[in-house]
Amino acid sequence: MNKRERVTVAFRGQETDHIPVCMWKHVPSEYWADDDRFADYQVRAFQNTDVDFMKLSGDKYFCWPSPLLEHIGKADELFGMEPLGRMHPHIRGQIERTKKVVRGLGKDCVSLYLVFAPLSCIRLQIGYPMMMKLIRENPEAMKYACSVVAEDLKLLVRGVIEEAGADGIFYSVQNAEIDRFTAEEYRDWVTPSDKAVLDFANSVSDMNAIHFCAWEGVRNRLSVWEDYRAPVVSWSRFIDEMDIREAQEHFGCTVWGGFDNRPGTFLYTATREEIEQETARMISRSGGTRYILGSDCSLHDELPEERIRWVSEAARKA
């Protein structure tokens, strides 16, 4: 199997010649101003780590540039939210840059583009405190704003897949920490816009992955995502305390993860031999199918790329 064949088969939950590997880091800010340099950085990361496919970063676009959000103070103002539109630089810029990355990676590389859920897009612009203030002040206003963002995200999803050539999206859903919302609040306030984008993405591609993000280090209320469907689920093995076989059974599909992404943990400190042994153990625990070896979330800048390559090479021997 070549890399594309291996990853495509893994997304279908079928047996591969070996377990695919994909871990990722963000692109440093000094590369953001030049799309060619940004693309080259991601292509070199693919080559240096020898992973089986690439999760494409959305760095530089972790915001939502709605003029209304710049000075938002009251929740009712969210009813004035307007779409950016398909020609807005925030949408077009991501599509055009992704074209360059996909072209540089070549036809053998499956690529998934990072897309944040609507509420996270708003939060990235205004911050957690204001997000929580507004949604508790008037949940319906925030739901409306999220629905507007969702329509723009559909334009982005279609563009990065059909125009830029990405195979699918890496859809990051967040904000389900056990101390943030009750299950009822999340399902009422957040789920509609989450699923609007997810369902649309699944209508465009059968190569999407859902990322149940635990970047904040707090356990997620996983029950609120039980009806979120995609061929692959990326989950937090350590924060959400769910091992590989348990995740396969819980999510009912191919699962992606395994290593703790946080600084100072095993992948950052272990010897090459220890990493090779742990790679083999995780693959064994997976049963050898319906598994992609990765990390809980984005790896930090201080992790040398050669450590990811150790995992890639070890997976081929396991």
Language-model-detected regions and their locations in the chain:
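Active-site loop segments of alpha/beta catalytic cores
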Residues: M1-P28, A33-D35, D52-L56, G85-A318
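N-terminal capping/small domains of soluble enzymes
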Residues: T16-G80
